[in-house]
């Protein structure tokens, strides 16, 4: 089977309801196209492929800003963003006909991304080329009470960014392997333990374990626990484009190498509990859930906007950084076709900024 999906939108009329001289909504146009193919035979083989294309152009700033005459000039303030992205992805899988619990699969993707933007007098150009492959095999150990998944992965990620006439390049090559074991005790208890080993061309060996537990007190009530670690390379500019609109300088404090931005990878441990209860009241269904999660960073790229009125500083964490989250949610359908959701969330996010642990904005 095949499918072709398209989506387009645009804003072509300038709007300034409060008459402050700046556009209330950016002008722009966007086009998305997705083409999908799927194939499956009766022998257990399945495959899916997709081709995606995106183009997105935006303009913001003062009402009478003309990108042809005023771009990167002091005449009028303007913002322009031009993004193009192309992606090819695929999944291939085989389920053994006589052993449905056994399968092998391959996930592939390739992405080309191009961003040409300007924010007032600052120009930002970014290119990214990425490839990803993940080979997965799953089966059982003895009986279906003991299942496992294992496989190999590969990430190739190339970044080339230029901001304020400074160029930052990095090439990430990350081969990896993983193993995941699942134990299921009837319908009461499930445990999943996993371990990943990745070798980064710059940061070397990375070990990331994880554990998930689930206990069903009743068919309607269950408790989940999760714990694990992870790492990533922060993308300073792509993740903080909202700060480009200011005229402040970007400063990377005490870079430890010439690789990329010169900062260490972010690493964190996270832990969490979830309690879910499903119920019926007056013949109508509902559910209640409560969550508590904590994340502790052993390293983090800190974005400091308060140290100086003329700078935005980036530096490696020196001290504590954590996030605590508690949430309660009630879902109920008092009448047919009427859903009610009540939720409360409490967040406590703190980071060490140049020696002082402060709330993260």
Show the residue positions of the predicted features.
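Flexible loop and strand-edge segments within Gram-negative outer membrane beta-barrel domains
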Residues: 10-32, 40-104, 110-128
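Surface-exposed extracellular loop regions of Gram-negative outer-membrane beta-barrel proteins
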Residues: 2-18, 28-30, 103-112, 116-118, ...
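Repeated loop/turn-to-beta-strand initiation elements of outer-membrane beta-barrel proteins
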Residues: 2, 43-47, 97-104, 143-148, ...
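Membrane-embedded beta-barrel scaffold of Gram-negative outer-membrane proteins
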Residues: 105-117, 216, 224, 261-316, ...
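Transmembrane beta-strands of outer-membrane beta-barrel pores
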Residues: 8-12, 39, 53-57, 96, ...
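Outer-membrane beta-barrel transmembrane domain signature of Gram-negative proteins
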Residues: 75-98, 104, 108-192, 317-329
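Gram-negative outer-membrane beta-barrel transporters
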Residues: 288-297, 314-361
């Amino acid at each position: 089977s095949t499918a072709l999906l398209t989506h387009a939108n645009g804003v072509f009329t300038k709007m300034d309801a409060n008459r402050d001289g700046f556009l209330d909504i950016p002008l722009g146009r966007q086009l998305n196209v997705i083409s999908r193919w799927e194939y499956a035979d009766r022998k257990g083989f399945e495959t899916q492929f997709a081709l995606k294309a995106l183009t997105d152009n935006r303009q913001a700033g003062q009402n009478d800003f003309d990108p042809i005459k005023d771009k990167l000039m002091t005449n009028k303030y303007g913002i322009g963003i031009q993004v193009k992205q192309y992606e090819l992805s695929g999944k291939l899988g085989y389920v053994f006909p006589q052993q449905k619990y056994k399968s092998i699969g391959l996930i592939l993707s390739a992405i080309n991304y191009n961003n040409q933007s300007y924010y007032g007098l600052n120009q930002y150009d970014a290119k990214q080329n990425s490839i990803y492959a993940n080979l997965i095999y799953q089966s059982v150990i003895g009986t279906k009470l003991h299942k496992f998944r294992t496989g190999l992965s590969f990430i190739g990620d190339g970044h080339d960014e230029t901001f304020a006439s400074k160029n930052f390049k990095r090439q990430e090559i990350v081969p990896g392997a993983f193993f995941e074991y699942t134990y299921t005790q009837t319908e009461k208890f499930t445990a999943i333990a996993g371990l990943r080993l990745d070798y980064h061309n710059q940061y070397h060996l990375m070990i990331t374990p994880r554990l998930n537990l689930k206990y069903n007190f009743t068919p309607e009530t269950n408790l989940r626990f999760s714990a694990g670690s992870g790492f990533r390379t922060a993308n300073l500019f792509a993740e903080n484009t909202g700060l480009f609109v200011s005229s402040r300088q970007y400063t990377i404090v005490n870079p430890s190498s010439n690789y990329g931005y010169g900062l260490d990878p972010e690493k964190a441990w996270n832990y969490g509990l979830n309690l879910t209860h499903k119920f019926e009241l007056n013949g109508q269904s509902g559910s209640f859930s409560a969550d508590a999660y904590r994340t502790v960073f052993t390293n983090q790229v800190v974005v400091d906007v308060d140290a100086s009125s003329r700078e935005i500083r980036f530096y490696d964490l020196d001290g504590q950084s954590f996030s605590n989250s508690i949430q309660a949610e009630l879902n109920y359908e008092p009448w047919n076709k009427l859903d009610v959701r009540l939720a409360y969330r409490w967040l406590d996010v703190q980071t060490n900024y140049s020696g002082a642990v402060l709330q993260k904005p």
